[in-house]
Amino acid sequence: MFSWLARMALFCLRPMRRYGRMNRDDDDDDDHDGDSSSSGDSLLWSRELERHSFGDFSIAVVQANEVIEDHSQVETGNGAVFVGVYDGHGGPEASRYISDHLFSHLMRVSRERSCISEEALRAAFSATEEGFLTLVRRTCGLKPLIAAVGSCCLVGVIWKGTLLIANVGDSRAVLGSMGSNNNRSNKIVAEQLTSDHNAALEEVRQELRSLHPDDSHIVVLKHGVWRIKGIIQVSRSIGDAYLKRPEFSLDPSFPRFHLAEELQRPVLSAEPCVYTRVLQTSDKFVIFASDGLWEQMTNQQAVEIVNKHPRPGIARRLVRRAITIAAKKREMNYDDLKKVERGVRRFFHDDITVVVIFIDNELLMVEKATVPELSIKGFSHTVGPSKFSIFLS
């Protein structure tokens, strides 16, 4: 039986709009871990399998919002690969800005320092944050609500056999490696490489309270959900200028984002948590995904799906599995949910972006593997040359 919300959504359907820039999901394979859908999802875009210097990658995006707020990219070069997942909120402006600028900042800083490092990642995040706040300053007179637009930002780089990850927000990078379980070495094990900067976690709430001891409303339980200042769940982001600088405060005509008291210090941070790992022979792949995926499945469930299925289309498979789970929560199946158009579909699941980077260990030893130097943007047919060539040449 459909829930009342599902019935309402299906009753209110308008004709589905199509996009020239989006690949229609035409997969008819009914082996999708419980997804027995018989036709494609017009809001699901993917690239099945591409090469990078150290293996393959697969990327998929599904739209739920009226205007998609997730942006993403994969940059491949001879001897390096870059992944970015940018989960926007309040609008697409911040995530789009990150997609257009962060990688260029990273290449500029890395070229100046002759290496890709944790410090280079931090500098790229800082430059991106300052650039977006400058954009907000220029445009907030005409568009005040741009001050309430922000984005989570998750990036990963593999270079010289090392994986570097930087993150603000609650997107995740999860490693799949062959570990031991009861003396068996053939079990895939999930290891979360990032921290969730989300007020749902007690340690995040404690951190905020310690940083703001004079503010009894720094975190508020609202309708069963912990929110910072009663407004937002993530504690770190790019953007969200109104929670960082008093000059961007919003007046009472925007009650959702109006703060009763002027900011004394930034409430949110754009400082990333950075992680470095020298890749081991047991490391098989990394899943980079926005929180729309992790709302529907655990880290271990995700790595097991990747491990037991063929590489081509694996990111799409993860997205479809997440949508199937979301549909079941509303007493629907995937075929029903595919009839729900963008905007209304946000009641059922978030925009979801998934990138799976496979690691072929023998290629880590190759100085410069010959692969196409490509720049691929999620949810877009546009493919161009990567700026990695500037740094790596």
Swiss-Prot record:
SUPFAM superfamilies: PP2C-like
Knocked-out gene: effects: Plants missing PP2C42/PP2C-D2, PP2C64/PP2C-D5, PP2C79/PP2C-D7, PP2C63/PP2C-D8 and PP2C68/PP2C-D9 exhibit an increased hypocotyl length, as well as an enhanced sensitivity to LiCl and media acidification.
Entry's Gene Ontology molecular function annotations: metal ion binding; protein serine/threonine phosphatase activity
Keyword Cytoplasm part of the UniProt annotation: no
EC numbers: 3.1.3.16
Binding sites annotated in the UniProt record for Mn(2+) 1: D87, G88
Domain PPM-type phosphatase: 56-359
Binding site for Mn(2+) 2: D87, D291, D350
Matches recorded under Gene3D superfamilies: PPM-type phosphatase domain
Keywords annotated in UniProt: Hydrolase, Magnesium, Manganese, Metal-binding, Protein phosphatase
Cofactor note: Binds 2 magnesium or manganese ions per subunit.
Reported cofactor(s): Mg(2+); Mn(2+)
Catalytic activity: O-phospho-L-seryl-[protein] + H2O = L-seryl-[protein] + phosphate; O-phospho-L-threonyl-[protein] + H2O = L-threonyl-[protein] + phosphate
Keyword Magnesium carried by entry: yes
Family named by the database record: Belongs to the PP2C family.
Name of the featured protein: Probable protein phosphatase 2C 68
Species: Arabidopsis thaliana (Mouse-ear cress)
Lineage: Eukaryota, Viridiplantae, Streptophyta, Embryophyta, Tracheophyta
